[in-house]
Amino acid sequence: MDSFSSSSGSPPNTEALMDQIKAQLAQAYAQEFLETVGNKCFAKCVTKPGSSLSGSESSCISRCVDRYIEATGIVSRALFSSTR
């Protein structure tokens, strides 16, 4: 039985199904975002990988991630405000 089937055989609750899909999409988006940001910031900030990050590498990664999060927020707000 898949996660969209109900045990009683009746059709699934549409609202509950939509909530489940939204939650799965949000989780997938967050995972993809973190992977992308992590890879880009690591590539930008860590020029000589070693056994640990230097202070400047750690600061660079932190600033880079903060900028990505801020930029994503700006773009999201712009998209949502233009659709209204």
From Swiss-Prot:
Its main location: mitochondrion. The keyword Iron-sulfur does not apply. One of its GO terms (biological process) is protein transport. One of its GO terms (molecular function) is metal ion binding. It is found in: Mitochondrion intermembrane space. SUPFAM superfamilies: Tim10-like. It holds the Pfam family zf-Tim10_DDP. One of its GO terms (cellular component) is mitochondrial intermembrane space. Keywords: Chaperone, Disulfide bond, Metal-binding, Mitochondrion, Protein transport, Translocation, Transport, Zinc. Disulfide bonds join 41-64, 45-60. InterPro entries: Tim10-like, Tim10-like_dom_sf. It comes from the Eukaryota. Coiled coil: none annotated. A motif (Twin CX3C motif) lies at residues 41-64. Heterohexamer; composed of 3 copies of TIM8 and 3 copies of TIM13, named soluble 70 kDa complex. Associates with the TIM22 complex, whose core is composed of TIM22. The twin CX3C motif contains 4 conserved Cys residues that form 2 disulfide bonds in the mitochondrial intermembrane space. However, during the transit of TIM13 from cytoplasm into mitochondrion, the Cys residues probably coordinate zinc, thereby preventing folding and allowing its transfer across mitochondrial outer membrane. Mitochondrial intermembrane chaperone that participates in the import and insertion of some multi-pass transmembrane proteins into the mitochondrial inner membrane. Also required for the transfer of beta-barrel precursors from the TOM complex to the sorting and assembly machinery (SAM complex) of the outer membrane. Acts as a chaperone-like protein that protects the hydrophobic precursors from aggregation and guide them through the mitochondrial intermembrane space. Belongs to the small Tim family. This is Mitochondrial import inner membrane translocase subunit Tim13. It comes from Oryza sativa subsp. japonica (Rice). The lineage of its organism: Eukaryota, Viridiplantae, Streptophyta, Embryophyta, Tracheophyta.
